[in-house]
């Protein structure tokens, strides 16, 4: 999990991390961990970490393509096998591990765990934030917009583009990830072509035109 800004700034000297996952694709039966099944105490959390029974109380959720998970700072989480996600997050590398599933680092040794810090920051309540196929859908001509997440750290939406769309954000940069299809981006006298799997950074105040048929993950701060 990741700490919030207050804890991370005081202990690590950098910001914490809130993030969002969008499931781009997944295998049948794939699951991820999102918080706990039910509320638990800090004491039980610590005991289960140390006796290696933490997975018994983790909230393992079957996922589907297009699902959305808002991972607020302090939420226990882990991506399971067979899942491809696009992640929107705060710019921070602070992560506290309580289990690494027996994996080894590049040096062949177990990676460091951060149990004491995790006990300080982990939310031991069952998550109450909706997840899955969520988000208000707005149709605007040839564009369908699905609002995924709006918080004080970032906002994210899914764009289904069928023809053209102008983008210009005065207050923030814009990040675009092409999930499906192909897009031509026109700006001033030039243009570039991007396709599935590509991402592009658009500076604040720059007006661009998107042309094509595509599914796009749009995020800004």
Residue ranges and their predicted role:
Residues 1-65, 80-182, 186-188, 192-199, ...:
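Active-site region of the double-stranded beta-helix
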Residues 75-78, 206-209:
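Short, charged beta-turn/beta-strand-edge "cap" motif at the junction between a beta-strand
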Residues 36, 73, 204:
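Conserved residues at beta->alpha junctions
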């Amino acid at each position: 999990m990741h700490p919030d800004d207050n804890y991370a700034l005081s202990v690590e000297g950098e910001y914490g991390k809130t993030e969002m996952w969008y499931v781009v694709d997944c295998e049948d039966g794939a699951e991820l961990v999102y918080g706990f099944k039910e509320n638990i105490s800090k004491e039980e959390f610590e005991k289960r970490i140390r006796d290696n029974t933490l997975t018994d109380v983790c909230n393992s959720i079957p996922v589907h393509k297009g699902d959305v998970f808002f991972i607020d700072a302090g939420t226990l989480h882990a991506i399971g096998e067979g899942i491809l996600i696009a992640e929107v997050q705060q710019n921070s590398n602070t992560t506290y591990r309580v289990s690494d599933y027996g994996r080894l680092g590049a040096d062949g040794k177990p990676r460091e765990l951060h149990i004491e810090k995790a006990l300080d920051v982990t939310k031991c309540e069952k998550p109450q934030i909706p997840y899955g196929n969520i988000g208000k859908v707005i149709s605007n001509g040839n564009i369908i917009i699905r609002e995924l997440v709006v918080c004080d750290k970032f906002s994210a939406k899914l764009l289904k583009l069928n023809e053209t769309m102008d983008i210009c954000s005065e207050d923030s940069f814009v990040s675009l990830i092409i999930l499906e299809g192909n897009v031509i981006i026109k700006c001033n006298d030039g243009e570039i072509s991007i396709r599935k799997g590509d991402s592009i950074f658009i500076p604040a105040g720059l007006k661009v035109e998107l042309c094509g048929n595509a599914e796009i993950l749009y995020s800004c701060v």
